Regions:
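Short amphipathic alpha-helices in soluble, non-transmembrane regions
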Residues: 92-101, 190-197
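Flexible, small-/acidic-enriched active-site or ligand-binding loops
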Residues: 57
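A structural signal for small-residue-enriched, beta-sheet-centric alpha/beta enzyme cores
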Residues: 2-39, 62-79, 85-87, 106-203
Length: 203
């Protein structure tokens, strides 16, 4: 597994109302937690975990062009994620959950970096992204361009899952993939088929 490196974490105990509005933080949630890492997709999953562990919302999450290997500054990495909360304690609890989740996930290296991760019960962030109810299982699938589209077909055929969102390349990081939903076991089967298909590309 290619481990995720947390590059920077900062807190704003009472951010400017104008900044909060532009970032999409709901009114009444002025406390922000900012994080950058070198793996965007793992960070999005970890941000979602925070919404289940603490009274926080993900108000911002964007990947950077070219990916971590082309980062322009030491703390840029591949993604900026921002949590919003009503109190400094809540936003710190949420960020602790993000960092804890990142310690246990990352990209797989099967000749190319890729990710096939089953979220057993999604929080508010991924639920909104996938358009599914909170608590739904999600298969989060990401790989380089040709691998992602080839393997997505295999994942959809391998299990009784629904394609909720397709990320067609080029994305900011030039990868592709998508979010599937179904039962937890179906999502796990889809993840397995996705990884097997990614491996086939180099054969």
């Amino acid at each position: 597994m290619i481990k995720v490196n947390v590059l920077a974490v900062k807190y704003l105990a009472s951010a400017s109302p104008a900044l909060c509005k532009q970032l999409g933080a709901p009114e009444g949630l002025p406390c922000l937690g900012l994080i950058t890492t070198d793996c965007d997709d793992a960070t999005y999953i970890a941000l979602d975990e925070a919404t289940k562990a603490a009274e926080v919302q993900v108000c911002y999450g964007r990947s950077f062009y070219g990916g971590a290997s082309n980062a322009s500054t030491p703390y840029a990495g591949e993604v900026l994620g921002i949590l919003a909360a009503a109190t400094p304690g809540a936003v710190r609890s949420g960020m602790d959950a993000v960092i804890s989740a990142l310690e246990h996930m990352g990209f797989e290296d099967v000749g190319v970096p890729c990710m096939a991760y089953t979220v057993s019960s999604c929080g508010s962030f991924l639920a909104a992204e996938a358009g599914v109810p909170m608590g739904s299982p999600i298969a989060y699938l990401i790989a380089p361009p040709i691998e992602s589209m080839y393997a997505m077909d295999a994942a959809l055929k391998a299990a009784d899952v629904k394609l909720c969102k397709l990320y067609t390349p080029p994305t900011e990081t030039n990868f592709g993939g998508g979010l599937l939903t179904g039962t937890q076991s179906a999502c796990q089967a889809a993840c397995g088929a996705f990884m097997d298909a990614v491996r086939e590309i180099k054969e």
